[in-house]
């Protein structure tokens, strides 16, 4: 009905006409001086009425020409995403997400908080194109557009997301107790004009827990202790380069009463500091990232992933709530290199080896940094 005797929340009882959408759509477009009204394919059958009503309004002098034009295209469907406002509202109302700006939500505020840039979204739209036939765009295309945009922009930094302490047992003997060694790295490897960043190497560092294996699998080139071989001989612990720093050789580890490794021990190989003469004389296959214990910045890092585990969560009458990904968010207490202490809300960085991260627009504060994972360095979903 277009006539309904009911109080309106804005105009009260002054106006009692509630036009149907089909009737209101062309009039509102004309009043707002819309030139191109872009609709999905289900509105194609309504275009004759849309044009007819605008023609009548023009004939009566109530509408300035030229009138709006309606165009219909297929909906842009992205795998692992739902765009139904009703279903998105249900996710918010039932607490499955933290709000409309939750970084897992496909809303503008959600994507922005996740670290998506206007340029990345424009690139994604250009690559997706327009069509009259329905289809699906893989979520990896959206992430790929973001990676391509951020690769040129984002400063680099080292971060340890699952930390375990590394102790260089011969550091004091080689360099003196309490001594620190400054290491440098480019802010951006492809833009030397953006300068260098500096951090401290010392006796105690943080490394990723996964960079140590007590019994290494085949092809593991990171840290492991001396190994006893089948013939009874001993294979020395593995050597790796600490990126931008020195080569070290693993000597063992310390465990707690439950048998969990809580500390990795290694010895520094002298004269192997990156950028110094002879540094490459010792060849290693593994390079790992690290953060110095003395100047590390502790931070909350929110590791976001796809909200749904099913590529088509609401297709064919499915209950989309049953397709929610239980691992779409995990929170880590991480250690970051000192350059990130100055990060402002909304700043984006590439955490080396991990991916692209953005300082959260709501919760990131001086002295309490919070970073959201935007995307990995490559598409690894389901791999």
Name every feature range the model reports, one short phrase each.
Residues 30-383:
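Catalytic adenosine-cofactor/nucleotide-binding cores of aminoacyl-tRNA synthetases and other
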Residues 12:
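Active-site beta-strand/loop architecture of penicillin-binding DD-peptidases
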Residues 17-31, 116:
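Conserved phosphate/anionic-ligand binding catalytic regions in large, soluble enzymes, centered on
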Residues 8-9:
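Catalytic core of the metallo-beta-lactamase
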Residues 2-3:
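Short, small-residue-biased leader/transition segments that mark boundaries at the very start
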